[in-house]
Design a protein with these regions (language model features):
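Active-site signature of alpha/beta-hydrolase-fold catalytic machinery across serine-
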Residues: 73-77
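DG-centered beta-turn motif at the end of beta-strands
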Residues: 66-67, 92-94
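Lipolytic serine-hydrolase domain surface
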Residues: 1-43, 51, 79-91, 97-183
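Alpha/beta-hydrolase fold nucleophile elbow
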Residues: 53-64
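Gly/Ala-rich beta-loop-alpha elbow adjacent to hydrolase catalytic centers
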Residues: 63-67, 71
């Protein structure tokens, strides 16, 4: 009987983490798909903005959670377009964004957003933290939705306490009011 041997105790100790790791696969694949689709959607959005389909009005983006992939990808494509990509986006607000805080990510966005570039974070957003830990290969990368963007000084950082990731759609008005963007 396995339970009566020393190996049984070891097997039982390994079985629980192994079960967790194998069940984490259901999170990983959809998350990678969300990132990929966000990148593609952002590139398409950038192209439509470059084509002038928005008219001659300034654009404001408010992106939360995985929607940040779309906006970040769009802003990156606008940056790659050089001068053509500038003066299209007036403001970009990222709320609980699962993107890196690195200068490589935020500096290009800063260069194409003519007005406010805002990172709204909450260090106690456990849902975002859990999703990040299951899907992030580099544990040294800081996540914008959980911390401040330090290396691009003109990025506004707001720590919104008690931001509930699961209820973000209901929280948007409150967040926009707290960062003085409600119009």
């Amino acid at each position: 009987d396995r339970a009566k041997t020393a190996l049984g105790g070891i097997a039982d100790a390994i079985a629980w983490p192994a079960t967790l790791l194998s069940s984490a696969g259901f999170i990983d694949d959809p998350w990678a798909l969300v990132k990929l689709r966000g990148k593609i959607a952002g590139e398409e959005l950038a192209q439509s903005l470059l084509d002038g389909q928005h008219g001659h009005r300034p654009v404001t983006f408010v992106a939360y959670s995985a929607g940040a992939y779309v906006v970040q990808s769009c802003l990156q494509k606008l940056y790659e377009a050089g001068d053509r990509g500038k003066n299209i986006v007036d403001r970009a607000i990222f709320i609980s964004a699962p993107i890196s805080t690195s200068k490589d990510v935020w500096q290009p966005m800063r260069e194409v957003v003519s007005g406010r570039l805002v990172n709204v974070h909450c260090h106690t957003d456990w849902i975002l933290l859990l999703m990040w830990r299951f899907n992030m290969l580099d544990p040294m990368t800081r996540l914008a939705g959980l911390s401040i963007v330090k290396r691009v000084p003109s990025v506004e950082n707001y720590n919104i306490k008690n931001l509930r990731h699961a209820h973000l759609p209901d929280e948007i008005s409150r967040v926009l009011e707290e960062i003085d963007l409600q119009e």
